């Protein structure tokens, strides 16, 4: 017979439901459940005396007849598509259904069939997000990949060949030889990966060669000479082959000013890296491009958010990363021209306005590969504390702000780089690259990372213990990170030209390949979910003050951040 229980008891048993609120880690961000797909009284839950048992919540349906491979029960989804409670069904490494799981023979409204061949992951009281996408990677060392995975990232895009000096400074893999060797190495890594070729050339042939060799994007970097001619040529080749172009512009303004670079774009779509400028770019006003409709602006995480320590740490980082010498006055002047508190403070606010669309790392090259997610939510928290409620919020919650910020490391880089058909959000048909979180540790320490529907990483206790939880508890690779499961669970993103030319067979790799698509004129700033603002941005050349649509953008540096020392005592 039906029974009534309190909201608190229900949340304790099945997790929060419609109207309940959840605090994210130790931030001041509070989400409210917008919808619950369950049928009250028919919830499924695994365990002794629970519902997912033979003849109850578990049906007799085989996998061949439609039962899912895995069900994640009663998870609170935080995604650009909504903040809702649902069961998630996975099949063949992709999201098969979202809604109500169970046994259709005994329960109403079931659209996710649980059968004898179904594994269960308990999502009660947990948060589920899409895996993160870091689109600004210097592949300096392979150990970055495990660090990124353990933080909740499931896709990395960038360039490099290891600790070569070109890679230490620039995110590109130059030439078909290096692209081939890097792709061959990817069979060892549980991570979706895409490579950017070097885009700095004034004639098309070398760039076309790299795209056909497997580059899924091209990178223009000032250390290789980002001249107007190189910009124009690279964008023309990208338009012909449907790959994205990322740009790090000319800090020293040697080959032109920001206006010359904008003119070289000719209105074509481009992804502008560290658009504030501390990571590089026309000094002091590269930030202007964040207001253009054809520019997709991103940040790297060392400037996220602006704190009392930001300026001091940047100078030393820059000297190391760009092969500069503190004993050469010109090198010191170059470094100091890039680090401006005024533009970094404005960057915080432009993120909160939705004018900056993406947050990435700049791994080991003035950025921390394991902190993309942490720095994103620290920025969101700082902005809520300093700027208050966003005008777009409709309830007594931070749902809109949370969707705006999660888009910055999930769907927006996926759209920008032509892979949103496969990753970037929790939607039916997309890859089951998913991250489960305890709300108290949200954004800081994941509870489980799934790659292609297989558990690839998780915190795990002593393997010799009688239960999984005794110390030492730390992150360890799981079965999805070993053997042939790696190639079956993750993919390499390449150009359509490379895929159709049989690159996988030519290189003899096991990991599957997917082609990027719709990276050019079909997208732009307006394609950036919840982050499509195009204010007119001006920078005072003397004071570096930044204005958007005439309004001065400034904020105080944070002295204390959430998601920091409280979580990293050990």
Curated annotation (Swiss-Prot):
CDD domains tied to this protein: Urease_alpha (cd00375)
Residues found modified as N6-carboxylysine: 219
UniProt keywords, alphabetically: Cytoplasm, Hydrolase, Metal-binding, Nickel
Gene of this entry: ureC
Pathway: Nitrogen metabolism; urea degradation; CO(2) and NH(3) from urea (urease route): step 1/1
Subunit structure as annotated in this protein's UniProt entry: Heterotrimer of UreA (gamma), UreB (beta) and UreC (alpha) subunits. Three heterotrimers associate to form the active enzyme.
Biological process per Gene Ontology, one example term: urea catabolic process
Subcellular localization, as worded in the UniProt entry: Cytoplasm
Domain of life assignment: Bacteria
Identification of the protein by name: Urease subunit alpha
Protein source organism: Chelativorans sp. (strain BNC1)
Positions contributing to substrate binding: 221
Keyword Zinc: no
NCBIfam families in UniProt: PRK13206.1, PRK13207.1, urease_alph
GO CC terms of this entry: cytoplasm
Recorded family membership: Belongs to the metallo-dependent hydrolases superfamily. Urease alpha subunit family.
All residue ranges annotated as the Urease domain in the record: 131-570
């Amino acid at each position: 017979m039906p029974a009534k229980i309190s909201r608190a008891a229900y949340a304790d048993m099945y997790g929060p439901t419609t109207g309940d609120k959840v605090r994210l880690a130790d931030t001041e961000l509070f989400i409210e459940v917008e919808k619950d797909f369950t049928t009250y009284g028919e919830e499924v839950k695994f365990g002794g005396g629970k519902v997912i048992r033979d003849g109850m919540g578990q049906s007799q349906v085989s996998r061949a007849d439609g039962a899912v491979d895995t069900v994640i029960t009663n998870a609170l989804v935080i995604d650009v598509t909504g903040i809702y409670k649902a069961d998630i069904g996975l099949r063949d490494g992709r999201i098969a259904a979202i809604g109500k799981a169970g046994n259709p023979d005994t329960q109403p409204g079931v659209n996710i069939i649980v059968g004898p061949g179904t594994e269960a992951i308990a999502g009660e009281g947990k948060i589920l997000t899409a895996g993160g996408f870091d689109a600004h990677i210097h592949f300096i060392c392979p150990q970055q990949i495990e660090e990124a995975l353990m933080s909740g990232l499931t896709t990395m895009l960038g360039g490099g060949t290891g600790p070569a000096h070109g890679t230490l400074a620039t995110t590109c893999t130059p030439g078909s030889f290096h692209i081939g060797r890097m792709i061959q190495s990817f069979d060892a890594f549980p991570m979706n990966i895409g490579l950017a070729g070097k885009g700095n050339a004034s004639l098309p042939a070398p760039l076309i060669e790299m795209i056909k060799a497997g580059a899924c994007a091209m990178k223009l970097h000032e250390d290789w000479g980002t001249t107007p001619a190189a910009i124009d040529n690279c964008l023309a080749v990208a338009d012909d082959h449907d790959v994205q172009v990322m740009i790090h512009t000319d800090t020293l303004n040697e080959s032109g000013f920001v206006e010359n670079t904008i003119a070289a774009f000719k209105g074509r779509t481009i992804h502008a890296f560290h658009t504030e400028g501390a990571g590089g770019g026309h000094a002091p006003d590269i930030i202007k491009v964040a207001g253009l409709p054809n520019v997709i602006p991103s940040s790297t995480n060392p400037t996220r958010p602006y704190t009392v320590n930001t300026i001091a740490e940047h100078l030393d980082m820059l000297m190391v990363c760009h092969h500069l010498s503190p004993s050469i006055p010109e090198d010191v002047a170059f470094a100091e021209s890039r680090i401006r508190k005024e533009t970094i403070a404005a960057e915080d606010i432009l993120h909160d306005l939705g004018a900056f669309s993406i947050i990435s790392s700049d791994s080991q090259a003035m950025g921390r590969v394991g902190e993309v997610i942490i720095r994103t939510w620290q920025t969101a928290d700082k902005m809520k504390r300093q700027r208050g409620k966003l005008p777009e919020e409709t309830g007594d919650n931070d749902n809109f702000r949370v969707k705006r910020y999660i888009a910055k490391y999930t769907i927006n880089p996926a759209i920008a780089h032509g892979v949103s058909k496969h990753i970037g959000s929790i939607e039916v048909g997309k890859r089951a690259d998913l991250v489960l979180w305890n709300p108290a540790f949200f954004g800081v320490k994941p509870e489980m990372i799934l790659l292609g529907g297989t558990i690839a990483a998780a915190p795990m206790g002593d393997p010799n213990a009688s239960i999984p939880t005794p110390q030492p508890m730390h992150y360890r690779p799981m079965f999805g990170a070993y053997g042939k499961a790696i190639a079956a669970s993750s993919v390499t993103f390449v150009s359509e030209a490379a895929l159709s030319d049989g690159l996988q067979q030519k290189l003899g790799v096991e990991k599957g390949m997917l082609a990027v698509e719709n990276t050019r004129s079909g997208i732009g700033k307006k394609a950036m979910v919840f982050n499509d603002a195009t204010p007119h941005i001006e920078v005072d050349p003397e004071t570096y003050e930044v204005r958007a649509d005439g309004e001065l953008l400034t904020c105080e540096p944070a002295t204390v951040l959430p998601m920091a020392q409280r979580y990293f005592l050990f």
